Regions:
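Cytoplasmic helix-loop-helix junction between adjacent transmembrane helices
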Residues: 109-149
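Extracytoplasmic
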Residues: 15-49, 233-238
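Helix-breaking motifs and short loop linkers at transmembrane-helix boundaries and internal kinks
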Residues: 46, 78, 99-105, 133, ...
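Extracytoplasmic gate region of multi-pass secondary transporters
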Residues: 34-35, 214-270, 330, 334
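Juxtamembrane intracellular "pre-TM" segments in multi-pass secondary transporters
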Residues: 2-10, 193-220
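Conserved MFS/SLC helix-loop-helix module at the cytosolic interface between two early adjacent transmembrane helices
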Residues: 65-104
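C-terminal ends and interior cores of transmembrane alpha-helices
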Residues: 88-101, 294-310
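Helix-loop-helix hairpin linking two adjacent transmembrane segments in secondary transporters
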Residues: 144-188
Length: 409
């Protein structure tokens, strides 16, 4: 990841922003590990599609609702330490997943994984809003967006390779231990900042005032549509390729990796492009609204066409199209939220928005699993997901109110 210039040209802050991008990468490596293991794990633990969907959704039972509180904590206490504690919890949960013996232990560890990972986006957005000027936030947020894509890309490549040669349990052990090493550069970098270890001295925003903002709930609804599509691909793509199209684990790994690499590369491009347009004098609100609406439309179209694809070439082309189309989504999703909230309320705002948006992670996997078990096909699940993405495109185009910093005093 390239170094981003920041307001004070401070190397420590530049390193901090890079580490925020990298922690999102680790977040998605560990979150997506269950999908890589799924073809073998489901058989070994004798899980139906519905029970597997239940295990996947368990991550969100805590991940989504706890963010209402986590965002508030990031605005009031040391956000740098909060992120470190969250990572330690999820890394240990990932490691211990390699020892599970059934559905119950899998569900429990998925819950703790969700608890640890819940800190990532409220903390990351708080740090970006605090340290990065508005005309550079497209690129700063592209680091997080690239992590969302490159985590599954390299995680699928590494995890698929480990699983193919050694089984799915060693994959969880290796991923969990590797994630813990992030704490070393993070603590060495963050502890040099004046704000490290102290309570936040910024003026507080009353929770009631924040919760009465229609724009925040509108963003939460839009966020729901983005995550519904993203988690559908992240969770079910490996099973879809293996079960519906007869791919081997190695073939599935290759196709998924190429798609996610395309998404990661496109994230850097769209982050740079959005900042360039803003610096050239275009309305930042119009740029970011247009990009996210177009992104959701592209995601929906790609998912719809995947339901009808039959040849490996067509599937790969559509997966790459999905990846490139999805890239602007996360960049602008968080950049718009940072515009609405401003630096002092960014943690709380993202916490509420992320919590609302990630409710899709609770219901989506269960709905998808039930559809697959009932129809013995992925077709209807793909159609439903495409429709949700299409609705999201319309919502961001016409449903989200005027994008500007709201009055919170």
């Amino acid at each position: 990841m390239a170094t981003i210039s920041v307001a004070a040209a401070d190397r420590r802050v530049s390193a901090l922003i890079l580490l925020v991008g990298f922690v999102v990468f680790l977040n998605y490596v560990d979150r997506g590990a269950i999908a890589i293991a799924a073809p073998l794990l489901k058989n070994e633990l004798h899980l139906s599609a519905t029970r597997f969907g239940l295990a996947v959704s368990a991550f969100f039972w805590v991940y989504a609702p706890i963010q209402y509180i986590v965002g508030w904590l990031c605005d009031r206490f040391c956000v740098y330490r909060a992120l470190a504690v969250g990572l330690a919890i999820w890394a240990l949960s990932t490691f211990l997943t390699g020892f599970i013996g059934g559905l119950a232990s899998l569900v429990i560890l998925r819950v703790f994984l969700g608890l640890g990972e819940s800190v990532t986006f409220p903390a990351g957005s708080k740090i970006i809003a605090r340290h990065v000027p508005t005309e550079q936030r497209g690129y700063a947020n592209s680091l997080m967006a690239a992590g969302i894509a490159l985590g599954p890309a390299l995680g699928t490549l590494a995890g698929g390779t480990i699983t193919a040669f050694f089984g799915w349990r060693p994959m969880f052990w290796i991923f969990g231990l590797a994630t813990l090493f992030w704490l070393v550069p993070w603590l060495l970098t963050a502890r040099e900042l004046p704000a490290f270890g102290s309570r936040n001295s910024e003026p507080r925003v009353a929770a009631g005032k924040l919760l009465r903002q229609p724009a925040m709930w509108a963003m939460g609804i839009g966020h729901f549509t983005t995550t519904y599509g993203h988690y559908f691909i992240l969770t079910w793509l490996p099973l879809f390729l293996v079960q519906s199209h007869g791919f081997t684990i190695s073939q599935m790994t290759l196709f998924a990796t190429i798609a996610y690499l395309a998404q990661g590369a496109a994230a850097f491009f769209f982050g740079w492009l959005s900042d360039r347009w803003v610096r050239s004098g275009r309305s930042e609100a119009a740029v970011r609204r247009g990009m996210i609406a177009g992104s959701l439309a592209a995601m929906g179209l790609a998912i719809l066409l995947l339901a009808f694809a039959t040849s490996p070439a067509a599937i790969l082309s559509l997966l790459v199209f999905y990846g490139v189309g999805a890239a602007p989504c996360s960049i602008n999703l968080y950049a718009i939220a940072q515009m609405f909230a401003g630096p002092r309320a960014a943690g709380s705002w993202i916490g509420v928005q992320n919590a609302t948006g990630n409710l899709s992670g609770i219901i989506g996997p269960i709905i998808t699993g039930m559809i697959i078990d009932a129809t013995h096909s992925y077709w209807s699940a793909f159609i439903l997901t495409a429709a949700v993405c299409g609705a999201g495109a319309l919502w961001f185009a016409f449903g989200v109110p005027k994008i500007e910093q709201v009055a919170l005093d």
